[in-house]
Amino acid sequence: MLYCTLNVQRGELMIDIHSHILPLVDDGSKSVDMSLEMLDQAYRDGTEEIILTPHLAYAYGFDNPREKIENLFEEFRNIVWDVGIPIKLHLGCEFLYSSKESFEKHFKDITTLADTKYLLVEFYFDVNEDVILEAVESVLEKGCIPIIAHPERFEAFQTNTELAPRIIEM
């Protein structure tokens, strides 16, 4: 398979901070080839850096603790280098927040976005406002900054227009 190494006109730096490209670890890419095709297309579309954010969601069977995904990430990054896709890869995770207890229990397994203080957090679709606020507080207490994945999916944001501004103020 041949991958793009075209000189694409670049404008501002584009970094994708949420992707399911790390192969065979969650509901994203189903193979290494699929992942390489996804990265190649992202590069062609102007993405220069991408954070691979596999699900860390034990309730859904996505058992992807830090050590496991770090090893898989290194293997995959070497493959990407070998085929010559000129895109910079970083690691993170998308953590499914269900309760403060679960968050505390699994915090050691969490990988922040590109080794920064930003943490990508997802919720069950029927999450209520109190759990969202608890999650934000819990993440902040750990010295991290939460980034809520797919806020448009949650009724709490749709029905309470003050929720997002309230979170930003925290």
Residues covered by each model-derived region:
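An N-terminally biased module of ancient metal coordination in phosphate/nucleic-acid-related enzymes
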Residues: Y3-I85, P165
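Extended substrate/RNA-proximal surfaces in nucleic-acid metabolism proteins
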Residues: F62-M170
